[in-house]
Amino acid sequence: MIRPRSNLGTLPEEPSVESKSGRTLAGITSSRKESGMRSRTSSGSAQAVGLGLGRRPSDNLFHGHADPLDTMQMLSEALPQPPKIEHGMRRERPISNDSIMTTKSSEIFSTSSSDTQSNISVATNDSEDHSFGMDKSVDNSSTNATLTNRSIENRSNGDSYSIGEKSDVSVNRSTKSGNNPLQRTQSETISVNMSHNRSMNGAMKQPTPPFMGKNSSIPNLRYNSQPQQDNRSVPNGEFGSKLYNLSNSTSAIIPNAGTGSKLALTPSQRYRLRKEQSEHALRDVIKRKEKLYDEQDGIIELQEGDIDGSFIFNVPMSSYSTTSFLNTTRQKDSATNSSSTITERITPGENQSQNNRESNMSFASTISSTSMLDFFEMPTSPIPGVNKVSDFQYLQDTTKHLSSVYLHSSTKLSKSKLSERTASADCLPLEFKEASEKGMEDLLLVSENKLDAVSHTRPSWLPPKDPEEKKLHEREISKTLSMASLDQLEKNKDRDSKIIKDETNKQKYVLLVDRNITRKSSLQSLKKIIWETPINAELRNHIYDMVLQSEARLVTERFTESFDDIIKLSNRIELTKTKEIEIRNLITANIENKAGGKYDVSDDLVLMLKLKSISQQGILPGDELLFHHLLIDDSFENLNQVWEMVNLIQMTCFNEITKDKFDSKILEKSGVVASYMLQDDSFKHEFNANCLNSNTWWNILERVNHDLFMWIIDIIVTMNSQPFKNSPINKEKYSEVNWDVYRDNKVLINYQILISFALNVLLNYHFGFNDLKSLADVKDKNFCIPISEENYLDIDEINSLFVGKWKHYFKKF
């Protein structure tokens, strides 16, 4: 609340002031609350609030220079209390950083005419914005108007101030206007403020007009009164900043810069001024340094790091190629030693010799820690004062001896380091080796520090691992590698044991043949060994012949055509072109386009199939595969043996009864195959006679390699063997019988071995095809069962695993 005025009294009414544009402006401070947020940005340096305290600390320091009675009376009676802060409204900062950053250092405290013009224009807008509130707060506006009129009327002799050079705003004092209480109060307020400024700028000749904050109503008015005879224009900087109503105005910071006065800055203003000046100074330093470096870029000696030899002619220096090999002290010590050495060389006299001697001793003690430096090679140095030698000559001889010792030692050191790095280059990660091969980095120049920063488990272009993380990873990797090493050792042990076992089994085959392979005990041993090791190539033909027909060889002699007879028959019969095309298409489809195409097809294969086509049996399923593999195998010496063995295998192991048994038993609902396949719905589309039959069985053998094919035939032949030693064949008895009688009495029908083979493939290697029938249509030539040879190095181990699973399912029957 405003205290009652004792001297001036109250104004009965508030006059209106008409501007140049014809508007009536009243209630000068009626919109004080409405423009409170913006009015706080002005700096009321000469005003005081409620309790007589200045709004800034600098205002309080100069209260004593004004008229005490007049000032205190006006402040206590006329000024109202500051308005309450409305916390719900947004407040702008009094002075923003933009006011400093957007102003150059040379313009930071200057006010040009453009500032005055902008101030006036803003003041005009503000006055128009606030003119509508005159009637709402007459009391507040009358109080502020009283202050304004008092300061205006305090000017004597009818003086008039014109605000700005080009502004229409003027504050006039005349005899007629002096009678107005509002104008008297305003004149007194301006007078008091100007007395403050004169006291603050006592040493200045020209008085400084006040800087009035936005709490004053004068900046928001336009006065248009009659011109007087004696008018004095106020300088631009005096009221211009007062008229400017923006928070980021440079003029709002220091209003009196235009008059040359020095007003005390607030701490925030001094801080921002120092900040701006330091930034300008930093920019200047950077520009000067960049200019210096740009000028030095053209100097080749500075680019290469060369130093004039005249500066260090007597200083022992290391060669560039071996500098990195030396275990010297830290860079700080080396820099200190080198600088002291250069200083000592320039300083003459005894002090120079003493300093040089101490420097050389420190240098010697530094490099003596390196084991490669041999100081025993250095000759005895003269003693100063005893030997007739000058200090300069002493220093020169000492440096020469040190240099010779160093050069000789560095040569040995470089050789030893290079040899160590050559030996350790093989232990570097593959990334470094590949980079070295491409010319990016020399492995011989990789230091131990770099090796500590790299890791075998992280690419070289990524940041190095943390030491703890690196240790943890190395432990895990070491553990994994140790386990893998143990597994590999087990595999190697198993492989070695298998090799030994294979050699042992091959020797057993020989012993079984010598002891008579057709004995019952021998056949039991043979059936046990055959799952571990295939039959020897040199014994295969003999074992096949003995276990399938014994020494009587009745099947070959009586139930099949001899090779000579079939050759004679082929010479008399000429095959048609259609038959030849069928034979060649059969070879192409079942051999060349399948796994058998990896091996060279024998030239006799077409002949053997032609002979088989004109025989009594004709070409049977699997004949082309049997002829192909037996022709390229080393077990059979001639075509006669191949012809006899193919016919013998077909008549004993794949005869009609075996095929019929296979077709019926494999689809038996209570059989072994059904117990496995019917448990999985994925087999329901192939558990039928169209997919599972004796003809589709041969589609599997089209996809196996030669070694596994021969091993499979070895097992099938062995499982169809009979102990002819215990029940020999009587030739006279079977000399007149047909093949069916002989087969029923002397041929073993073993379909279980064929069904178990198909079951093994269906359960464990059923990938790449839908069923056994579609297996023949797979176009991939490299598709192989159990696995392609290109995908695995140890194919023998894979074959052994395949046979082991086959044995497991065979035991189920």
Curated annotation (Swiss-Prot):
Biased composition (Low complexity): 107-121
Annotated disulfide bonds: none
Domain of life, per lineage: Eukaryota
Biased composition (Polar residues): 139-160, 169-200, 214-234
Signal peptide stretch: none
GO biological process, one term: fungal-type cell wall organization
Localization per Swiss-Prot or TrEMBL: Cytoplasm; Golgi apparatus
Basic and acidic residues bias (residue ranges): 56-66, 127-138
Similarity annotation: Belongs to the SBE2 family.
Function: With SBE2, is involved in cell wall integrity and polarity processes like bud growth.
This protein's name: Protein SBE22
Species of origin: Candida glabrata (strain ATCC 2001 / BCRC 20586 / JCM 3761 / NBRC 0622 / NRRL Y-65 / CBS 138) (Yeast)
Lineage summary: Eukaryota, Fungi, Dikarya, Ascomycota, Saccharomycotina
Name of the encoding gene: SBE22
